[in-house]
Amino acid sequence: MSNQELLQLAVNAVDDKKAEQVVALNMKGISLIADFFLICHGNSEKQVQAIAHELKKVAQEQGIEIKRLEGYEQARWVLIDLGDVVVHVFHKDERAYYNLEKLWGDAPTVELEGVIS
C-alpha cells in the first residue's frame, strides 16, 4: 500500500466516525517522523476514542502494523503511528492549544477526497 493510499485509508476511517476539521500535512522533507500527519478532532472523549478505535480496526483489517498508539485512555490527544502516516486525534478543547497546523506551518496541506469538515 502506498503512502497516499494509507493516508486515504486513515482519512476514510476518521471521517466514518465524524471527525471534524480533518487536515493532512505533507511532511516529506520536513520531518523524519513520517511522510504525512493527519490531524482531526472529536467533540468529546467518547468520540475521540471512537475515532481512534475505528482507525485501529481498519488498519488491522488491512494488515497494517500500528507502531504506536498513545493517549487513548485520556482521550485528549491520541496519537496513532501507522509508519509513514501519523494520525493525531485531538479533543476539540486541546486542538487549538497544541495547534500542530501552526507548529508545522511550513508543511503543505494535502487535498483530501470525500471529507466533509
Swiss-Prot record:
It comes from the Bacteria. It is found in: Cytoplasm. Its main location: cytoplasm. Keywords: Cytoplasm, Repressor, Translation regulation. One of its GO terms (cellular component) is cytoplasm. One of its GO terms (molecular function) is ribosomal large subunit binding. Disulfide bonds: none annotated. The keyword Ubl conjugation does not apply. Gene3D superfamilies: Beta Polymerase, domain 2. GO terms for biological process: cytosolic ribosome assembly; negative regulation of ribosome biogenesis; negative regulation of translation. InterPro entries: Iojap/RsfS/C7orf30, NT_sf. The keyword Transmembrane does not apply. Functions as a ribosomal silencing factor. Interacts with ribosomal protein uL14 (rplN), blocking formation of intersubunit bridge B8. Prevents association of the 30S and 50S ribosomal subunits and the formation of functional ribosomes, thus repressing translation. Belongs to the Iojap/RsfS family. Interacts with ribosomal protein uL14 (rplN). PANTHER family: IOJAP SUPERFAMILY ORTHOLOG (PTHR21043), MITOCHONDRIAL ASSEMBLY OF RIBOSOMAL LARGE SUBUNIT PROTEIN 1 (PTHR21043:SF0). This is Ribosomal silencing factor RsfS. It comes from Halalkalibacterium halodurans (strain ATCC BAA-125 / DSM 18197 / FERM 7344 / JCM 9153 / C-125). The lineage of its organism: Bacteria, Bacillati, Bacillota, Bacilli, Bacillales. The gene is rsfS.
